[in-house]
């Protein structure tokens, strides 16, 4: 299965949908990280979620979901770019009982931040409390508070796979309020019959045909999705320079070298004494 996102539209109504199915990018995100299984599941749901939400981007940029709380998972971060590059990470404590995988147990009391960062222009942030029992419920609260658009999400993750379904009612343009309300209630009821095992294991065409066989949606071309990281030697170099003269001098004198590891992709960049001395000169 190639990782992809499939948009679907219902003729003569102001309702749209997105279906995301991921495998290789999830495997790449979690490999070598030693995440407990419930944390892997939470990461998978978050990655599927940002892939769905990034469909709202009308410009070049990135969308990020960040959740922080007082539970054993102190940080959950997932990002998707306008062209379908995905990455994610989680920070968690050790020695925990990982038998429960709901968001309230894993992250606990906290907040979720959705950040939209255009390549050009001003950044936008929406902040909501982690008040739902699932990540999907928390995101539905975000849409209700920040976007004020009726939105339903279904997220599933397991066995190095993740998938998501989004259904959203847009402002009236193609139909009347009554017509859109009736169609929304009908489609929402149909989508609610979806089982998480079906979302994870069936192909998108089969899922959409089973759910909406009486109102077949239009299917534009699917968008491929893939793992991708924005780390680079230049960014790591700039991060070291930003430490300032004193810390750079200390690194040079005590260690003579430094290796930085990207938290997302585990790529390492090594800087030797010559590199550090050059950075020290630049920072003065």
From Swiss-Prot:
Source species, domain of life: Bacteria
Gene Ontology molecular function terms on file: protein folding chaperone; unfolded protein binding
Keywords: Chaperone, Cytoplasm, Disulfide bond, Redox-active center, Zinc
Disulfide bridge positions per record: 229-231, 262-265
Transmembrane parts of this sequence: none
InterPro entries: Heat_shock_Hsp33 (IPR000397), Heat_shock_Hsp33_C (IPR016154), Heat_shock_Hsp33_N (IPR016153), Hsp33_helix_hairpin_bin_dom_sf (IPR023212)
Any GO BP annotation: protein refolding
Subcellular locations according to the entry: Cytoplasm
Processing and modification events after translation: Under oxidizing conditions two disulfide bonds are formed involving the reactive cysteines. Under reducing conditions zinc is bound to the reactive cysteines and the protein is inactive.
Location, primary (coarse class): cytoplasm
One annotated Gene Ontology cellular component of this protein: cytoplasm
Family to which this protein belongs: Belongs to the HSP33 family.
Physiological role: Redox regulated molecular chaperone. Protects both thermally unfolding and oxidatively damaged proteins from irreversible aggregation. Plays an important role in the bacterial defense system toward oxidative stress.
Protein name in the entry: 33 kDa chaperonin
Native organism taxonomy: Bacteria, Pseudomonadati, Pseudomonadota, Gammaproteobacteria, Oceanospirillales
């Amino acid at each position: 299965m190639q990782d992809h996102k499939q948009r679907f539209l219902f003729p003569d109504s102001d309702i749209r949908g997105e279906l995301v199915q991921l495998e290789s990018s999830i495997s790449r995100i979690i490999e070598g990280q030693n995440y407990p299984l419930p944390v892997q599941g939470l990461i998978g749901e978050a990655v599927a979620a940002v892939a769905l939400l990034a469909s709202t981007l009308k410009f070049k940029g990135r969308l990020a979901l960040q959740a922080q709380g007082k539970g054993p998972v102190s940080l959950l971060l997932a990002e998707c770019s306008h062209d379908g590059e995905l990455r994610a990470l989680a920070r968690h404590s050790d020695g925990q009982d990982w038998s429960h995988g709901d968001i309230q147990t894993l992250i606990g009391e906290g907040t979720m931040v959705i950040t939209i960062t255009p390549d050009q222009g001003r950044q936008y942030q929406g902040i909501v409390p982690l008040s739902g029992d699932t990540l999907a419920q928390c995101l539905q609260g975000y849409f209700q508070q920040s976007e004020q658009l009726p939105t339903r999400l279904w997220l599933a993750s397991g066995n190095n796979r993740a998938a998501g379904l989004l259904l959203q009612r847009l402002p009236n343009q193609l139909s009347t309020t009554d017509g859109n309300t009736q169609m929304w209630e009908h489609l929402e009821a149909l989508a609610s019959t979806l089982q998480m095992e079906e979302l994870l294991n069936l192909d998108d065409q089969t899922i959409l045909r089973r759910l909406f066989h009486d109102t077949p949606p239009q299917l534009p071309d699917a968008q491929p999705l893939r793992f991708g990281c924005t780390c680079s030697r230049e960014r790591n170099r700039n991060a070291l320079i930003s430490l300032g003269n004193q810390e750079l001098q200390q690194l040079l004198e005590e260690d003579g070298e430094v290796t930085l590891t990207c938290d997302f992709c585990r790529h390492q960049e090594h800087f030797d004494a010559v590199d550090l001395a050059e950075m020290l000169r630049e920072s003065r």
